[in-house]
Structures are given as C-alpha cells and as structure tokens.
Amino acid sequence: MTENHESHVFDPVTPDSPETAVPEVPGAQAAGCPVAHGRAPHPTQGGGNRQWWPDRLNLKILAKNPAVANPLGGDFDYAAAFRGLDLPAVKRDIAEVLTTSQDWWPADFGNYGPLMIRMAWHSAGTYRISDGRGGAGAGQQRFAPLNSWPDNGNLDKARRLLWPVKKKYGQALSWADLLILTGNVALETMGFKTFGFAGGREDVWESEEDVYWGPETTWLDDERYTGDRELENPLGAVQMGLIYVNPEGPNGNPDPVAAARDIRETFRRMAMNDEETVALIAGGHTFGKTHGAGPAESVGADPEGAPLEEQGLGWRSSYRSGKGGDAITSGLEVTWTSTPTRWGNEFFHNLFAYEYELTKSPAGAHQWIAKDAEATIPDAHDASKKQKPQMLTTDLSLRFDPAYEQISRRFHENPEEFADAFARAWYKLTHRDMGPVQRYLGPEVPSEVLLWQDPLPARTGEPLDAAEIAALKEQVLATDLTVAQLVSAAWASAASFRGSDKRGGANGARVRLEPQRGWEANDPDELAQVLRALEGVKESFDAKGGKQVSLADLIVLAGGAAVEQAAKDAGVEVEVPFTPGRVDAAQDQTDVESFAALEPAYDGFRNYVGKAARLPAEYLLLDRANLLTLSAPETTVLVGGLRVLGANTGGSKHGVLTDRPGTLTNDFFVNLLDLGITWKSTSSAQDEFEARDASGKVKWTGTRADLVFGSNSELRALAEVYAGDDARQKFVTDFVAAWSKVMDLDRFDLV
C-alpha cells in the first residue's frame, strides 16, 4: 500500500551520518558542555569503538533483545495473556477508534480505516523471503529506522490514535498484534470479509540492528542496482526508505510498463506471485487516498529526528493547517474510487473505463487523471467538492503490463474471485513471518491448510521411550556411517532454520526432499548415502510392529549419538538431550520455489561460502549465527566443535586444527592460539590461509571464518576460555547445549 541481507554484521559509519553527527545544544560552548560540535560522539550518542574501526564485527547482533531490556520479565507469558482477551470486545474498541475523528489529525472521509490498512500493510510489507527478515512479527514499525522511513510518513499518527486501545488492554495485546488486527478490523468495518487473524506476535523493546536495509546513506537513494536494473539481494524495495516501489515510477519516471518490472521483482521478493500482487494493489487502493496537498519543503523532521516536545511524532507540516485536506505525506494526491470507505470493485472499473493523461499533484509529483470523465470522486474533507478519477503510475501498471492486465480484467469481471484473492493475499502478507501454525493464537485462525505455511502432518502414535532411543542409537552407530557424516546430516537438517521468519529446521525432514537434498552446502551425494543408511535403520525399527520412528527424529538422534561417541572418544561422558515427536513432511507439502530461498549461500559453521556470497566469510558466519538465534559463546563453541568433528562442506580440511578428527576435543582453540605458529594468506582474495611452525612446515590451513576467532578481540576472549587446560569438560558441555538448541529451534510443538 503506497504513500509516498545479510544482517548488519559490521557498522559502516560516514562522517555526516545521523549516528555520528552531534546535535547543537543551546549554550553548550559557553557552558563548557562536553557535547560540542566537531568532537567524537559520546557513547550515549552512538560513539565508541565503531567510531574508530567502522568495519569491526558487530557481535551485538548475537545479543538481540536481552532479558535486561525487557520490562515484563522472563516469566511473562504473552500467549497466555493473549488467550485471555475478549477478542470481539477488542475489535469493537478498535472499530470505535476508526470512526471517531480527532481534531489533531482528522480522519479522511470520517474514517481512519484506510490509514490503518496502510499502517498494517507497511508493518508487514518489509518482509523479504531471501533472509526472512522484516515483517510485522515484532512491531518494529515503532522503532527506528522504520518509524521514520519516508514511505511510513504520518503512520506515527495511526499508532498514536490506537494508544487508548493499547492502554486499555496493556500487555495482553502487543503492539505487533494490534497493528495487524487493526488492519483487519478496518477492512471488516468497511464491508470486507477477511480470511482470518492470528495473534502471537510478541513485542521487542529495541530497534533491530541485524537487518540490512541497503547501502544508501540518503533517503530515497537507490545505489542497490547493478547491470540491467538488477536489485541487490536480499533487499525487497527499490529505494532506501520505501516499502516496495516508487509510486511515480522507477526513480520518478512515470512509465507504467517499467514500473511493472519493479513491482514484479519487489513483490516476488516477499513471496507474492502475479495474482497476489494484483489483488493486493487493487484491494488496498480500493480504500482511502494519498496525500500531497502542498510542497514537500513544508514537512518537518521525521519522528526520530523531531524535537523532544513533539513526543515521538514527526512530519509536522507548516502548509496551511498541516492536516486534513492540507496533509502532505507522499506528495501524491489521488483518491481511487467514489466509495473510499467501502469495499467494492470500482478500482478496476476506473482503471479500464478511461484513458489517462499525465499530470502533477499540488506537490509536483507525477500522477494520472482520467480524460473525458465526470467528477465522481469525493473530497476527503469537503462534501461539496468532486474530482475526476486519478491513478498512480504503479496503478496503471496493472493495465499496461500484459500479465497484470489479464489478471486485472478477470478480477474486474469476477468480483467474488477478486475478493477471495485479496483476502488470501492479505492474510499471507500479514502472517508470512510468523512461522508454522503452531505459533498462531486466537479464535480467528483459519482451519484451511496453506502451502506457504510449510505444513506438517499430524503426529500419530506414542513417542519413543528411553529404551527405544538407546536401541536406535546403537543401531545408528553400528552402521558404516562416520561421526562426520552423521553430524553433517543432522546439521544440514536443523540449521536450515531461520529465526527471522521461523522457517526451516529439522522437523519435517525436508532435507530429504526437493530442493534441500540438492543444495551444494549439504553435500548431496554424501547426504544421500547417510539418508539411505538411516532409512534402513528406520525400516528395521518400524518392522518390529510397535512404535514408528520418523526420519526427522532419526536424523537428529543419529547426530546426537555421533556427538556422544565423539565426546566419549575424547574421554568425556555426555548425554545429548533428545525430545522425540518430529514428523516427516511430504513433497507435496513443500513449496519448492519458496523453500529455495532458504538455501544457504554461506555457512561458516561448515566453512562453506558459495559463489554468490558478497561479504568476507567472518561477517557471513555472524549472519548465519544471527539467523540461528545463537549467542557469541554458542557460535564460538559450535564452530570449534564442528571443525574437529569434520563437518565441513566437501570434506574440506580448512580449520580442522586437530590430529584427532571425529573426536570432540578443544583442539581447534588450542591450536589456533598456539604461539608457535604463524598464519599467512595463500590466496589473492585473502580468504584462505596456512599456518607454519618454527621449522617452516605447513601445519594447518584455515579460512577467515577460522582465523577470526584469534583475530577479533572479543571472539578471541571466548576462544581463550575453550583453549584453557581446564576447559575439556566445559567445552563438551557447552557444545552439547548449543548443538541441542539448534536441533530444537523449530520445535514450536514443545512450547
């Protein structure tokens, strides 16, 4: 709905960036205030180590949302609190807000519904399928940078209007859920039947630092393209600060056909096909209007840059009253239908009934007006005024792009089909980042199984008991499979998980299905050998006529058995925790195209960097650790353990700093920190290295993902813990804990 990567593993800082600029404080120089222009920023302003070493690893992304930042405490159970809500009563309270216009920000057409639809859309619309980041799941629209994106102009007012509802229901209704629920209520009160709503989005209490929004340092800049307008991965918008595309056309060029290319690419990157794209654009633009009553120069600072007395509101306009009919948001001034607060099919009628000519809004933005048309479109604040139908450049893309036109005409002729398509696409848009349906809460969750939710079959039968688990471990270890093979297969299965959108993981055993079984990082031939052997173990166990074991459980159990054996060989007895209950998904429950987005282009835990990776390996390792929701200590111990267990992709010896591969020792850390060796680069890209001892003999080889644990001061401090003479037991214990965490990341059925 328009008005208008990899995570941050390092912190680019420019001299004039907002985080390094020092605000002028009246009287500061005269009073000797330390906050003086031209000085390095105080730590409270974002100064510190990053000021001096902007390319240093940002380990803070491995410590997201710490417990000390949560005012609710660790015992707060949001799911239980949400279940206690009277949801119909909440919706009635929201509906009352929607039709109670406030003088401080008057409602267009007497109804805030369209504004709230845009708010919900923009909350969810930051999601991108490539890394699963963005989306509505944590209510990040409240925080920088999203609260101040140009495309989110004046949505601060929408959230402020909802404060009475939030205040009434307190922590039983998160902001994240409230934003999406309000979008649904807005649609319903304007005559549309939604597909459903699920709660369960828990609020966080700090801005995300792990999302790469683009390389630009200026709003609406577009340095993200190369070649023939090829958009950088994993980005999902065409310009910095936009949700999707520029409504005026590419870089403001009012070309509907060229705009269609941008639309298709950006919507594809958030998992929408052409039909869903048309439904969302047309459905959203059935309601409300854009705002461009005057020049953009009249608009003040965004919420994050506004003075304290604005109390979190931004974009104060000096143009006339600055609100209502004088409001400025995108600079465009378009109302699409004659019934902007009621669901209908008029958008398509207006799209096809007229020829349009290019014009400009009062703010000077490119838009289109119907030729030879009557003035049928109402004014939002003056009932005596009417205007001709108008469209955005991106609206006309639905008419002039051949594929979009075909869909649009079908929807025009079949209103019920259009309504169903919009309902489903809206539900997908607003729930795409929530993960499996086990996480959905509330009485309005649809019963229909949807492929994009990565469905799993229902679990049947009794879970395995301790004796059966022990017997299966013995059977696994009696095969010809090595520790490295078993560990690698389990990691390939479980480490596909992404904490960003809760997709992937071991449950479902999709590692045996397309597309995962063919991923380069998973060593397809080696993986196939392991799966055949484990399927044999499964068949033997199942044939006894008692309980059945899923391959999903068996893959994880086998990896755990291998870890136990490797620890035993190192002289440490340990039991790897295992909770049965995983199920096996079928190929027809797996959207191959959608799952392809989960393929790792890099995995530092397996010392794997694919050809498409664009950052040095140590940054990519942190990005993968962030997606796996790992801390810095967990990342450190897992890398050290997986190296000595031989879990590298392709059997690479890089980083296998041990004479006892397959044994769970702390040798990786001991040998990395050995004062008797010297590391030197062996590649022009400086991504491969060799270590020589005093005699000049090559002792080890490694990559940037290995050497960083001796180079980065914070990671070295962690490596020193595990390299200590007293660390043998602690290393194994911590490795097992971190391993088990990864194996269970997708076990939402256990919550």
From Swiss-Prot:
Keywords, ordered alphabetically: Heme, Hydrogen peroxide, Iron, Metal-binding, Oxidoreductase, Peroxidase
Enzyme type, top EC level: oxidoreductase
InterPro entries xref list: Catalase_peroxidase, Haem_peroxidase, Haem_peroxidase_sf, Peroxidases_AS, Peroxidases_heam-ligand_BS
Post-translational modification: Formation of the three residue Trp-Tyr-Met cross-link is important for the catalase, but not the peroxidase activity of the enzyme.
Cofactor: heme b
GO cellular component, one term: cytosol
Site entry (Transition state stabilizer), positions: R118
Superkingdom to which the source organism belongs: Bacteria
Binding site for heme b: H285
Chain positions of cross-link Tryptophyl-tyrosyl-methioninium (Tyr-Met) (with W-121): Y244-M270
EC nos: 1.11.1.21
Record's cofactor remark: Binds 1 heme b (iron(II)-protoporphyrin IX) group per dimer.
Family: Belongs to the peroxidase family. Peroxidase/catalase subfamily.
Annotated function: Bifunctional enzyme with both catalase and broad-spectrum peroxidase activity.
PANTHER family hit by this protein: CATALASE-PEROXIDASE (PTHR30555:SF0), HYDROPEROXIDASE I, BIFUNCTIONAL CATALASE-PEROXIDASE (PTHR30555)
Name used for this protein in its record: Catalase-peroxidase
Species classification: Bacteria, Bacillati, Actinomycetota, Actinomycetes, Kitasatosporales
